[in-house]
Amino acid sequence: MDKSKRPFLKSKRSFRRRLPPIQSGDRIDYRNMSLISRFISEQGKILSRRVNRLTLKQQRLITLAIKQARILSLLPFKRKGFQISESTARTNALKARTQNKDQKKEKFQINKKKK
């Protein structure tokens, strides 16, 4: 048989079903912080359903619980861990440039007032 005439054969890989992220005993509630915190990113954003591997109903309930927890100040809207790092050469140059612009504006305004 010709190589081009052979049927395409897929390799048989073993398929291991992943455990669902939410077990049947878990209650999706704004007070269940250990459960809710698993579905929030490093920056404090709610992860998508595709990343979480949740059903539509579970994702909706998780989103509502996270929003309720944020409103009740149980969860921050943004993570505090996301801090400004030390300045680099690029940021220093940018700061210097903006300071020069501000100084030029002040001089221009002073000269304008004198006239």
Swiss-Prot record:
It comes from the Eukaryota. GO terms for molecular function: small ribosomal subunit rRNA binding; structural constituent of ribosome. GO terms for cellular component: chloroplast; mitochondrial small ribosomal subunit. It is found in: Plastid, Chloroplast. Its main location: plastid. The keyword rRNA-binding applies. Gene3D superfamilies: Ribosomal protein S18. Residues 91-115 are annotated as: Disordered. GO terms for biological process: translation. Residues 99-109 have a biased composition (Basic and acidic residues). It holds the Pfam family Ribosomal_S18. The keyword Ribonucleoprotein applies. Keywords: Chloroplast, Plastid, Ribonucleoprotein, Ribosomal protein, RNA-binding, rRNA-binding. Belongs to the bacterial ribosomal protein bS18 family. Part of the 30S ribosomal subunit. This is Small ribosomal subunit protein bS18c. It comes from Ipomoea purpurea.
